């Protein structure tokens, strides 16, 4: 896994470096904020699940600004693309502690059902490292925004990230042994998609689609504040460490995804 991470980061770096040779200006920034992780823990579209399974993320971001040239400190030719698009690169990390909430583990069910107790006692976490790019579209002029302190620049984006995930699954039920059948809710004991059980502590990697909506605020001529609401869909259902057999349990067949509300600061290097 470390070799794969190094290879992806190097490829990512040199691709940006090659693009940078065209003279576009650069921006760097830091983002952070809460991450609501939607997984096989809890009940989907349930408020307690959404609120309870919320973690935290932090990231470094880099932008290529096509409207300005760093090599001559001048504007690029005025085209629609140059004045309305930026290319964002990102290296980020998020971690979320996970547990079961919702209608299957209400106090009434916990008082009467051992299965409900087993489900509630199953907990976990996942840590995800992202590296990827997004193309941001600004409906208003980037040039006008750059020249006007106190202005706003709303945007939407779409891109792809490569993700390295490290889940942890454990139980507090009985003697706390995860591989003891009597300690685990039955549906997680069934083999699933090449694994012996519907849970796994194996690290892995996968692609994801990333889309966001947000805005910038021009703080100074060389700095912006940013707020960004992002949706990220993983091409795997093992990111959280749980994946009950999707054929037998179709309610759990959806892949994992998250929503990240991040706030950040951006500085113009050129």
For each of these PLM feature ranges, what is it?
Residues 20-71, 266-270:
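Short glycine/proline- and aromatic-enriched beta-strand/turn motifs that initiate or cap beta-hairpins
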Residues 24, 50-56, 83, 127-131, ...:
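Residues that define the transmembrane beta-barrel architecture of outer-membrane proteins
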Residues 43-49, 96-130, 165-206, 238-258:
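Extracellular/periplasm-exposed beta-strand and loop segments of Gram-negative cell-envelope proteins
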Residues 33-39, 65-67, 92-98, 161-167, ...:
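Structural signature of outer-membrane beta-barrel domains
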């Amino acid at each position: 896994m470390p070799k794969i991470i190094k290879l992806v980061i190097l490829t990512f770096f040199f691709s940006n470096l090659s693009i940078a040779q065209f003279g576009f200006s650069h921006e760097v920034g830091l983002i952070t904020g809460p991450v609501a992780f939607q997984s096989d823990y809890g009940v989907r579209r349930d408020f307690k699940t959404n609120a309870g399974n919320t973690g935290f993320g932090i990231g470094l971001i880099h932008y290529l600004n096509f409207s300005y040239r760093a090599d001559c400190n001048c504007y690029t030719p005025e085209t629609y693309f140059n004045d309305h698009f930026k290319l964002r690169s990102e290296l980020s990390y998020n971690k979320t502690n996970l547990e079961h909430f919702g209608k299957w583990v209400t106090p009434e069910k916990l008082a009467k059902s051992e299965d409900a107790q087993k489900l509630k006692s199953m907990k976990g976490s996942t840590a995800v490292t992202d590296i990827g790019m997004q193309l941001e579209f600004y409906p208003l002029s980037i040039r006008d925004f750059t020249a006007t302190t106190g202005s706003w620049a709303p945007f939407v984006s779409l891109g792809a990230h490569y993700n390295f995930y490290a889940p942890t699954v454990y139980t507090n039920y009985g003697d706390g042994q995860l591989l003891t059948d009597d300690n685990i809710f039955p549906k997680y004991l069934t083999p699933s998609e090449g694994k012996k059980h519907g849970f796994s502590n194996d690290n892995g990697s996968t692609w994801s689609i990333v889309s966001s909506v947000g805005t910038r605020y021009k703080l100074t001529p060389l700095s912006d504040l940013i707020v960004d609401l992002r949706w990220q869909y993983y091409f795997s259902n093992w990111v959280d460490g749980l994946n009950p057999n999707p054929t037998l349990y179709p309610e759990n067949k959806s892949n994992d995804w998250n929503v990240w509300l991040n706030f950040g600061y951006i500085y113009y290097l050129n």
